[in-house]
A protein has these predicted regions:
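Active-site SXXK
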Residues: 35, 40, 125, 151, ...
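Beta-lactamase-like hydrolase cores
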Residues: 104, 119-147, 231-234, 247-248
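Non-catalytic, structured segments within soluble enzyme domains
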Residues: 1-116, 259-260, 264-265, 274-278
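Short, well-structured active-site flanking segments
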Residues: 47-52, 169, 183, 193-212, ...
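Second-shell loop/turn segments in exported
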Residues: 9-27, 36-37, 41, 65-71, ...
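A penicillin-recognizing enzyme superfamily signal
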Residues: 115-134, 145, 156, 163-175, ...
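Conserved catalytic neighborhood of penicillin-recognizing serine enzymes
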Residues: 4, 67-71, 197-254, 314-344
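Mid-domain, small-residue-enriched loop/turn segments at the edges of structured enzyme/sensor domains
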Residues: 215-219, 250-291
Length: 575
């Protein structure tokens, strides 16, 4: 609960007499205040009810509390800053106050604000942001921790180090930064999965590729993996596949999808291909990004962030009630697919260093050029958390691993004592074992035994979108171990070895070396049964047309009809 500074202390409007100071001389001020209130009633400027209400208000106790806070140097937290701005904004937009009236009402109107903050989670976030062990530089950081099912913000930290004052720069809410690869999930992948343009098993060729203006696009690791599923592209943050997915649905569709996820800082200047990889004119805030990922955790339902549940006046009347209006950013099955993929990010991809055991987790990393901005945003069945790191002046960084360390530390502590939960919605998806090089149904003994290793994956699909055809991209060859050539019918005793290759692969990618050799010559060493029985050339001596002459006095054997002693088999088969 947040108690705002409340009620105005009456004065004469012109003079400031020390003897009437409400802090040091409250009794004198109370008498003066009664005189003024009675005069206002006499003149008809206030009603009897308003006069009595003002008299009953114990404003002096609140003044003493606020003065004590000022003397002790108490400064509002980043959460309280954000809360104040939201309440003032709602007083203007919902209650119709002017901005000046809203500020006066909040700080002098006796209001009580019921906040969504969890003080223990706020303490955890502040502690971890300021833990020096995570850093090798003096980069700045922001953290947002939300309940994705209500939209309620539980904790916010808008900067690292000692907070210099109240209502100062809050990097979690106000700073717009380039989102890097975190935008892919809520941009092109969400848009393409939502519209059925791709599945998690759809395969794109991760090969040299260019923007429409001819500029080449490169992956972070500087290499190309060849045929790659959408899932693997999300897990390993592959830029080429992201841009190809972007092109599947088009710029306008992706832009509209991002608007559905609440990114309000996007402008018409952001309608460019670079948006696919997080290249924006202004950028996004941590609050926007964390809220967007919260929508995925909430089965596709977007809830705007809130810092309070209600605001009441001194009489207990509700002035503001925060009941967020939700909308469906994506279907629940689309959210389930994205969650499925981002669970793999945590298990085997770029989120491994942010993961911890004992809870279902999904998340995505993001890094811009020269690591000017580094991100990790992810969620559990309980909370969604976003961590940003970088310099206020956009300087380059040498490392960005600290955002994952902070995310893990915050989320691990936030989940202490909470029962394990799995993500809801994924149970409606249909599993199928696919070949990851073509996206079709895997063939046992073929796709799981290739020269590139096991190329099968249990993938999940919206019912009706799973593949129906079997793998068409792999071919098996059996080789003679002796000759190294394709085994023929007569290589039965020499030993054979099978190799499974790709039918084709793009040059310059990892697939190029996995394509079947062009030499399809059948074994030249074993061309007949003769070669089977005499693999080293035994029994292959040519006999002359006539047998050698016998000695003159040697008795000649009687000639048998049908027998020809010139051939070796006559020694085996007697007629």
């Amino acid at each position: 609960m947040f108690h705002a500074l409340s009620s105005e202390v009456m004065g004469d409007g012109k003079e400031r007499i020390s003897g009437y100071d409400p802090l040091n001389y409250p009794e004198n001020n109370r008498e003066r205040r009664l005189l003024v209130l009675n005069k206002l009633l006499e003149l008809g400027d206030i009603s009897q009810e308003e006069r009595d209400e003002a008299v009953a208000d114990n404003v002096y106790e609140r003044i003493a509390q606020n003065h004590t806070a000022a003397e002790t140097g108490e400064i509002y937290s980043y959460f309280e800053d954000a809360l104040i701005y939201q309440v003032v904004g709602d007083l203007v937009n919902i209650r119709g106050c002017t901005e000046e009236e809203a500020w006066n009402l909040l700080f002098r109107g006796g209001l009580t604000v019921y906040s969504t903050q969890d003080s223990e989670l706020q303490r955890i976030c502040e502690t971890e942001v300021n833990r020096e062990d995570w850093y090798t530089s003096d980069a700045q950081v922001s953290v947002v921790l939300m309940d994705p099912y209500t939209g309620q913000v539980k904790a916010i930290v808008g900067g690292r180090g000692e907070k210099g004052g109240s209502l100062t720069l809050n990097r979690a809410v106000s700073s717009v930064r380039q989102p890097g690869s975190t935008i892919k999930v809520v941009g092109e992948y969400a848009a393409a999965l939502e519209r059925g343009a791709v599945t998690l098993g759809t395969v794109f060729d991760d090969a040299p590729y260019s923007y429409q203006n001819g500029d080449p696009i490169r992956n972070a690791n500087g290499s190309y993996g060849g045929r790659t599923t959408v899932r693997k592209a999300i897990v390993n943050s592959i830029n080429v596949v992201a841009l190809k997915s972007f092109h599947e649905v088009g710029l306008d569709t992706v832009f509209a999808q991002l608007q559905e996820f609440g990114f309000s800082n996007l402008t018409e200047e952001d309608r460019v291909e670079a948006l696919a990889l997080g290249g924006t004119h202004n950028g996004v805030t941590n609050l926007e990004l964390t809220t967007a990922y919260s929508a995925i955790a909430n089965e596709g339902t977007y809830l705007p962030p809130s810092y309070y549940t209600k605001v009441v006046d001194r009489e207990g009347r509700i002035l503001l009630s925060k009941t967020p209006v939700d909308h469906q950013a994506v279907r629940s099955v689309t959210a389930a697919l994205l969650t499925e993929a981002m669970e793999s990010v945590m298990a085997e991809g770029t989120g491994v260093n942010a993961a911890f055991s004992g809870m279902a987790l999904a998340g995505k990393s993001g890094t811009t050029s020269e690591m000017k901005d580094v991100w990790f945003v992810g969620y559990s069945p309980y909370y969604c958390c976003g961590v940003w790191g970088g310099y206020d002046d956009f300087s380059a960084q040498s490392s960005g691993s600290y955002v994952k360390s902070i995310w893990r530390a915050v989320m691990q502590q936030a989940h202490q004592g909470l029962a394990y939960r799995s993500f809801e919605g994924t149970e409606s998806l249909m599993p199928a074992v696919i070949c990851t090089k073509c996206g079709e149904l895997a063939v046992e003994g073929l796709c799981d035994a290739t020269v590139q290793d096991n190329m099968t994956q249990t993938e999940y699909f919206v019912a009706g979108t799973e593949p129906a055809e079997s793998c068409s991209c792999h071919v098996a060859y059996t080789y003679c171990e002796e000759s190294g050539q394709i085994a023929g019918n007569y290589c039965v005793l020499s030993g054979k070895v099978s190799q499974v290759y790709l039918v084709q692969g793009t040059e310059g990618t990892a697939d190029a070396e996995a394509v079947a050799p062009e030499d399809d010559t059948v074994c030249q060493m074993h061309q007949s049964w003769w070669n089977v029985l005499f693999p080293e050339g035994e029994g292959t001596q040519e006999w002359e047309d006539t047998p050698p002459p016998a000695h003159e006095d040697e008795e000649q054997p009687a000639e048998r009809p049908g027998r020809d002693d010139r051939y070796w088999w006559n020694d085996w088969f007697r007629f």
